[in-house]
Amino acid sequence: MQRGTLIFTAHCHPVHRFLHLIVVLAVILFGCYPASAQEFPKAADMVVNGQPIDIRGENYRQLFQELRDVHRFTQQELDTLFAGVAIDRKVLELMDKQWEAKPYYEYWPLFITPAVIATGKKKLKEHQALLDRIEAEIGVDREYVIAIWGIESRFGTNHGKYGVFKTLNPLFDAYPRRSKFFRNQLIQFLLLCRDNQIDPLQVKGSYAGAFGQTQFIPSSFQEYAVSFDGDQRRDVFGSIDDILASIANYLHSFKWVLDAPVYVDIGNRLRSAKLIQANLSGRKALVDWSEVTSAQGITLPRPPQDRGLTIVGLEIHPTEGGGFRYVAGYPNFQAITAWNNSNRYAMAVSELAEALNSGH
């Protein structure tokens, strides 16, 4: 067991030790975690804030070997970079309390406000020529590019306050559920910093390791960021051309279709078992356009290439009657969920884009 990952020691509360033993016994006897134990303990419960991460352990030994042998970092560079890395317990707590878990009526007001709408409309006018070019060359609707920019970084005014390198280390070391994912993000972050001559210790971002005005995670930057200002350098911190074009390029890479539908309301009740099951199964469960029109008794525009639709239930505030508002998410909606794996996020982007396109 690695030091810096689990603290099943004198630091661990006796109740935690007892519950941990129950979980271990369940795994031994039944080969799986009991349902009630899957949520306990959370990663933050198993560490002490500020405790040193053991970079001599097997996980870091393998990481350093890959960084040396595959990516040509020197041991001296690694020793300097990783000296003193430690657990930030707040990062682990935030990972388990993400906004996407809120009901939609609590979620959307976090992002769609009169101030955001007003600023977004100003940005549409300010960058009209650039957005014309983005639509012509990349093929993504301008309001959605601006909406994502507004939600991700408040149009560049909020890049995040966490050191990205200092954040990615505890997520790799002490967040077992996604350790493999954050290991890759840590590698990609070091590579992009080296390629762009950036000091890894100076980059600020979100608690999940996203950075810049796009709030790309490192692997997304590597794959989708583009230079659109002619300098051949991908700058998601200061170049508005690169920032907006990179957002558009991401959506384009997931088959965004210009001027195509994003979502359509289909009522407050689902009228077929297929639609109910699709809603319960999440964003990857697609249903045919004809099934939605037939079951709901409504007319819908056909999706591009007759691709499938996502069925999304959005919680209505109890003071407004409660229940759900259901929408059919089109392929463009699905492109937004490729950016952020959340139907609520995609809906907030869509409704903000609509507000930016309105005359009010």
Regions found by a protein language model. Give the residues of each.
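Acidic/His-rich structured neighborhood in mature extracellular/periplasmic domains
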Residues: 107-246, 252
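Bacterial N-terminal signal peptides
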Residues: 20-31
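Sec/Tat signal peptide C-region and signal peptidase I cleavage site
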Residues: 33-37
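C-terminal soluble interaction/assembly domains
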Residues: 271-360
